[in-house]
């Protein structure tokens, strides 16, 4: 089985969000299982490990009515071959996204992915595309390449990591920039504009999302950002596969950033030492109170409006809070003020420090994730890996990965409705459970037993890749 994994970012080379973690981890897990999985991505101006890249060739790529240069480089890391597509006009910039011509940049990249197959000794069975930046790959494949022998058996999978970002532009971009003639523009047109993601949903052989629950949620108008009717029509080719985490990179037994390494065999001693260090760092009282933490972008979608409503009440109940993140000014201001109002009870760090986040995962007693919507979420899995039971709202991948322990089973605390009252009640349940040390230790042990490795996700993807031809 040969898989070409097309993504706009992948660790360790370039990252702006969770997509990079997936593109850097899933192919590695597939290769470990004997799949010939390769990654193709842009060669950005601030790409890491540029010194490892090997020049292969260059060629022209059609972009509307003109052609653009494309240089091809490659590198091999952890057994995975990475291809990098170079065009300095499009990609030699600071940052990955947010430019006025992003539509043109990634239309070029999508077309270049297919053109590259003429110049490498590799013909994939499946091209796995990811998010709107690669959404035109299946569109171009069906329109301009399917009749060629090299391409006529290639299947495509389109993975939706976050349906909120669809790649929407004015329809004038279609012919001039994307090279899609008027006869075929209906494939990409939606709601009066060009919608790259819509084109992929129409033309890809399979559609996946990053969790089973999210696959069901996006059929509902509340979650779909306008694409629910189309997705219900294409539901026969839609499924959800839960993402994983890098269990080696997130390992409390070897993590160089935490003050005391521990495993499932000595977590009591280890977490106590990490908690003490965390409380000292944030100036919190060491009086036996539980420490509940959040590591997240400070935006409403992550549930910060709920936390804002219950924070004072939680502190009054004897819970200490540690908050790490940045984002909307209203939340940054509130949690900075909260820290000032409750010295010794609340610690806030505005910004993001990877090392500090690891210290929080290890030192906190519980981890709060009350998201309004969460396609998959990785933080709750990392928290479990470090023996820190999550408190989550039942949505998306949170619902698929965390199960309520109130009745003696499960690996965290959950609530269903998006309300401050339900979040407060879940936190109270967690505090009560924390005070029962024997049951709490059993819960921590259960959390650390959870297998959220990419090996599990890779098996699910392999099952999809190997489905009989009649199911494609």
Region locations from a protein language model:
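Catalytic cores of nucleotide-sugar-dependent glycosyltransferases that transfer UDP/GDP/TDP-activated
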Residues: 1-472
């Amino acid at each position: 089985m040969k898989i070409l994994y097309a993504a706009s970012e992948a660790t360790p080379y370039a990252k702006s969000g969770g997509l990079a973690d997936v593109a850097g981890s899933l192919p590695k897990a597939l290769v470990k299982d004997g799949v010939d999985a390769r990654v193709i991505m842009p060669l950005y101006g601030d790409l890491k490990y540029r010194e490892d890249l090997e020049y292969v060739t260059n060629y022209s790529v059609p972009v509307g009515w003109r052609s653009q240069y494309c240089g091809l480089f490659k590198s091999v890391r952890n057994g995975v071959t990475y291809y990098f597509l170079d065009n300095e006009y499009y990609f030699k910039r600071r940052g990955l996204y947010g430019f006025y011509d992003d539509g043109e940049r990634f239309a070029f990249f999508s077309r270049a992915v297919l053109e590259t197959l003429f110049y490498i000794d590799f013909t994939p069975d499946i091209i796995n595309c990811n998010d709107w930046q690669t959404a035109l790959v299946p569109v171009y494949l069906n329109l301009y390449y399917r009749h060629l022998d090299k391409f006529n058996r290639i299947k495509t999978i389109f993975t939706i990591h976050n349906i909120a970002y669809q790649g929407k532009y004015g329809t004038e971009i279609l012919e001039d920039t994307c090279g899609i003639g008027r006869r075929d523009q209906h494939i990409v047109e939606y709601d009066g504009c060009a919608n790259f993601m819509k084109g992929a949903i129409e033309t890809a052989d399979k559609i996946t999302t990053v969790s089973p629950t999210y696959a069901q949620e996006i059929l509902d108008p509340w979650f779909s950002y306008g694409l629910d009717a189309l997705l219900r029509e294409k539901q026969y080719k839609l499924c959800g596969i839960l993402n994983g985490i890098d269990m080696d990179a997130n390992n409390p037994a070897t993590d160089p950033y935490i003050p005391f390494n521990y495993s499932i065999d000595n977590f009591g001693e280890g977490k106590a030492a990490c908690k003490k260090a965390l409380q000292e760092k944030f100036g919190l009282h060491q009086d036996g109170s539980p420490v509940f933490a959040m590591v997240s972008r400070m935006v409403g979608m992550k549930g910060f409006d709920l936390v804002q409503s219950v924070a004072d009440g939680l502190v009054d109940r004897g819970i200490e809070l540690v908050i790490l993140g940045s984002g909307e000014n209203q939340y940054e201001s509130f949690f900075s003020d909260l820290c000032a109002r409750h010295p010794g009870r609340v610690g806030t760090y505005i910004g993001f420090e990877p090392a500090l986040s690891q210290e929080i995962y290890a030192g906190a007693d519980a981890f709060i994730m009350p998201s309004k919507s969460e396609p998959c979420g990785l933080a709750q899995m990392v928290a479990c890996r470090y023996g820190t039971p999550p408190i989550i709202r039942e949505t998306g991948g949170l619902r698929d990965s965390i199960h309520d322990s109130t009745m003696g089973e499960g690996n965290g605390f959950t609530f269903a409705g998006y309300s401050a009252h339900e979040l407060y009640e879940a936190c109270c349940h967690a505090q009560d459970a924390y005070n029962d040390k024997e049951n709490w230790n059993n819960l921590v042990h259960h959390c650390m037993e959870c297998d959220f490795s990419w090996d599990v996700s890779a098996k699910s993807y392999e099952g999809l890749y190997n489905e009989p031809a009649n199911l494609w």
